[in-house]
Amino acid sequence: MHESPILSNGDQPNRWAGLNRRVAALLLALIGFYRTFISPLLGPRCRFTPTCSAYGLEAIQRHGPWRGGWLTLKRVLRCHPFTPCGCDPVPD
């Protein structure tokens, strides 16, 4: 049986951590861009509390870029006129 390259090489976890930080920074920057430049043009449209962009920021900060990004994508796809409004916090 062979060892996983992530576990056998001490540098691998640092590479993954660096990648995760870069992906998280990119996602947070995209949300910041949306909040600064696009959202003011569109006006308030989100059906949920917190707003989808606030949800995305919190989800990525709490759960990291991969799970937080997935939760954010699912939330944005639920934000349409056929979904009831309401409170939809980031899950633990």
Swiss-Prot record:
<comment type="similarity">
    <text>Belongs to the UPF0161 family.</text>
</comment>
<keyword id="KW-1003">Cell membrane</keyword>
<keyword id="KW-0472">Membrane</keyword>
<dbReference type="Pfam" id="PF01809">
    <property type="entry name" value="YidD"/>
</dbReference>
<comment type="function">
    <text>Could be involved in insertion of integral membrane proteins into the membrane.</text>
</comment>
<protein>
    <recommendedName>
        <fullName>Putative membrane protein insertion efficiency factor</fullName>
    </recommendedName>
</protein>
<keyword id="KW-0997">Cell inner membrane</keyword>
<dbReference type="GO" id="GO:0005886">
    <property type="term" value="C:plasma membrane"/>
</dbReference>
<dbReference type="InterPro" id="IPR002696">
    <property type="entry name" value="Membr_insert_effic_factor_YidD"/>
</dbReference>
